[in-house]
């Protein structure tokens, strides 16, 4: 009977038996005083050796007798040789019965897949061309008490992979590569901005007023101060306070928290880049964003063509720039300018499209609802969607030519919002009025409307220079660059319901 035919109880019993056997082996090691030593220091990594000596022949390696010390987890044990894995990759280690003591040879026979060992020896190459370490000494560093998933079927259950990411990382090289890329992307973003004189800062994660975005916050209680507080939904208002204070180019890469739905594109805890630069506008940020995205694609993929599922996104071409209003007309030719400019018609169109219309929305809000329902998912290639109505952009500067819209863009790729940016509103009186309008919307039933932040208005009253700001979703960006279908694939420990 295959393991796929066994019921869960039988599988659990089998695992318990294996765990018991491994615990017996650990107990024997403890009795000898050999459990969990911490005095080994490696001098080489597995994949570094593979790269460094790729051109060395069997004869050259034999003559050079290069000594190495490696360590890693046993992923394959054939008796005469083992394959170990460290953070860089894998290498074979050869069990030489002529050079290893009998006691060591006996211990090696008791080792299991998943055990972590330390090996010393010299590099050699097999007749098949594989690089390996001919061991002169080897010992157990850590006994693995739980068996790894079956090598033929692996860890394939998606929910189990998310819950036990540590096992997922051990057995799935592509998962390890995804998170290497994530680290690489964040490091490059830092370098990209610092080269342009941006200062990295940290702003509060606990806030008395949740601001900077339209979202539901997580609430908590500060016992020492006896006050309600919120996990931040965005760092924006604090970063702009820093611009007021004289830090004219700032950025932060950190987590935001929004008490909202979970999907393949949404996680309540997610990572954002936000950056602000004085004496710039939203069009400057478009140019900067295109440059950054092209560099990241080239870094990760070696090309500005980004494959995702059955599509290819072209980062090397100029990103399309289109207003909210014009995009609705372009992708819905049955609609007219008159339809979108009549509030009753716009409300009917939004309702028919499936938007949750509450009845108090203005024309601009309704236009955005129509855009979200009828256009957003159609924006496959990179699109900068501009000129968002001021009703839905309470922190953005009004457009000089049309005060009903703002100098704002959102970047969409693959039908998903990746970035949001605008020329910042620095008129304190206008900001106060917009906060008041947001409070009225909240009182009317809009849970995502913003609170009034009197201290932020006060900061603007000291004067903020003309500024452009932007937020980029790191998780969604990494999804694109790693061809990952779900946001949970690029978050190490995504939130899950407790197991029954």
Swiss-Prot record:
Compartments reported by the entry: Cytoplasm
Co-factor(s): Mg(2+)
Spell out the molecular function terms from Gene Ontology. Answer: ATP binding; lysine-tRNA ligase activity; magnesium ion binding; tRNA binding
Catalysed reaction per UniProt?
tRNA(Lys) + L-lysine + ATP = L-lysyl-tRNA(Lys) + AMP + diphosphate
Disulphide bonds in the chain: none
* Residues binding Mg(2+) 1: 410, 417
Query: What InterPro entries does this protein's entry cite?
Result: Aa-tRNA-synt_II, aa-tRNA-synth_II, aa-tRNA-synth_II/BPL/LPL, Lys-tRNA-ligase_II, Lys-tRNA-ligase_II_N, Lys-tRNA-synth_II_C, NA-bd_OB-fold, NA-bd_OB_tRNA
State where Mg(2+) 2 binds.
Answer: 417
Q: How is the cofactor bound?
A: Binds 3 Mg(2+) ions per subunit.
Which EC numbers characterise this protein's activity in its record? 6.1.1.6
Q: Report whether Ribonucleoprotein shows up as a keyword of the record.
A: no
UniProtKB keywords: Aminoacyl-tRNA synthetase, ATP-binding, Cytoplasm, Ligase, Magnesium, Metal-binding, Nucleotide-binding, Protein biosynthesis
Tell me which Gene Ontology terms the entry assigns under biological process. Answer: lysyl-tRNA aminoacylation
Output the superkingdom of the source species: Bacteria
| CC annotations in GO | cytosol
Instruction: Output the Gene3D superfamilies linked to this UniProt entry.
Output: Bira Bifunctional Protein, Domain 2, Nucleic acid-binding proteins
Record-stated family: Belongs to the class-II aminoacyl-tRNA synthetase family.
Complex formation: Homodimer.
The name this protein goes by in its record = Lysine--tRNA ligase
Query: Could you tell me which species this protein originates from?
Result: Pseudomonas syringae pv. syringae (strain B728a)
> Taxonomically, what lineage is the organism?
Bacteria, Pseudomonadati, Pseudomonadota, Gammaproteobacteria, Pseudomonadales
